[in-house]
Design a protein with these regions (language model features):
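Bergerat-fold GHKL ATPase/HATPase_c domain
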Residues: 1-65, 92-99
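Short amphipathic alpha-helical segments
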Residues: 42, 46, 86, 90-94, ...
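Short N-terminal helix-initiation segments at or just after the protein's N-terminus
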Residues: 10-21, 71-75, 111-119
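GHKL-type ATPase core
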Residues: 109-206
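Conserved phosphate-chemistry cores used by DNA topoisomerases
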Residues: 34-52, 69, 74, 80-83, ...
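Conserved beta-strand-loop-beta-strand hairpin that lines the nucleotide-binding pocket
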Residues: 55-109, 148-151
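Conserved, well-folded catalytic cores of nucleic-acid-processing
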Residues: 37, 54-57, 100-105, 129, ...
Length: 209
């Protein structure tokens, strides 16, 4: 989503002393607020934010009518995942996007939903680590995003290989709390009620849109 430039206010100052600019300190507290504190309903936010990213990637790739895939957690397969078939990401793009808050590739067009560069980090509101699989032009990179010992979000390349899989990105994380299985299901129903293009949802070997 294209962000409007804020109005430039000209302050008229006279007889002032030293002027200091406001800054944000690179700290675990700041990252916790940006990753988790923004969301009151964390499961709903994760589904919404990652799905918006998937839709935007499909639009950018010219695949706006192609559904993306999600997997809802259950007893036999206790994880959540979302896999798009959009542009995919190179190694440098993964490192840049996932380690820079407010970094977005979508600030110059109104065709896209997102723009703030926060949604890709939303899984940190629920869990301390998740997996990102990025496929781009025959290269597959598998990464682990995690909170390090200092409380700072980090990402590491775990494996890299050639592939014939279509471009796209998959985000996956474990859901250890069984009582959250039903909540993921109900929140997905709520979120996708407002999406014109529904994903393909898989659950215990069954798939539906």
């Amino acid at each position: 989503m294209k962000l409007l430039n804020s109005v430039q206010n000209e302050a008229i100052l006279s007889n002032v002393g030293e002027v200091g600019e406001f800054r944000i300190r690179n700290s675990a507290k700041a990252f916790s607020i940006l990753s988790s504190g923004l969301y009151s309903n964390k499961i709903r936010a994760i589904i919404r934010e990652l799905s918006c990213n998937a839709v935007d990637s499909h639009i950018a790739a010219g695949n706006a009518s192609t559904p993306y895939d999600i997997h809802l957690p259950n007893t036999l397969e206790p994880w959540f995942s979302i896999r798009d078939y959009g542009l995919g990401l190179t190694h440098d793009q993964v490192i840049n996007l996932y380690t820079t808050y407010f970094e977005s590739t979508k600030t110059d067009s109104n065709e896209f939903i997102g723009a703030l560069g926060l949604g890709s980090k939303s899984p940190f509101s629920y869990i301390d680590n998740f997996t990102v699989t990025a496929i781009k032009d025959g290269r597959k990179g598998i990464y682990t995003a995690f909170i390090n010992e200092h409380g700072i979000p980090s990402i590491a390349l775990m494996m890299e290989e050639e592939t014939t899989d279509p471009n796209g990105v998959e985000v996956r994380f474990a859901v250890d709390q069984r009582y959250d299985f039903d909540k993921f299901r109900s929140e997905a129903r709520f979120v996708y009620e407002y999406f014109s293009l529904r994903p393909v949802v898989s659950e215990i070997g069954r798939a539906h849109v």
